[in-house]
Amino acid sequence: MWKPNEAGAASTLNTTAGDYALFVDALLNGKGLKPETLREMETPQVAIDPACRICTKQEPKELSKNLFWGLGWGIQRNDGRDALWHWGDNGSFKAFVMAEPKSKSGVVMFTNSQKGLEVAKPVVDEAMGEESLMFDWVK
């Protein structure tokens, strides 16, 4: 397995889908974090501009009423349900995770394909029982 020489904010997480699922399970069940820390992570901090993924040089055109960033997680609000989500993109490897704290359910998906996120939406929608709103933005 490739191992980076230095840790970074992106692209240096090396794990398996099973181990990452254990991490998500611990998060959903409040293990390893103070309750107030977990609440803060799950609270929308910034609304997403659906028209712009990397918006450092322009003002937002419109802010989403359903997609936000919490602390370290994307947050989707859909029909009164909040779900946490995140994705990884290392070129030819893609990953996606979605978890719903209220129902304590989630899905972790790792692929070894540049087109891995193309199959993620139907898998995530089926597993979570709701439409995933962020895939148009993630692309």
Where are these regions (language model features)?
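Catalytic loop of the DD-peptidase/beta-lactamase superfamily, centered on the K-T-G motif
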Residues: M1-K139
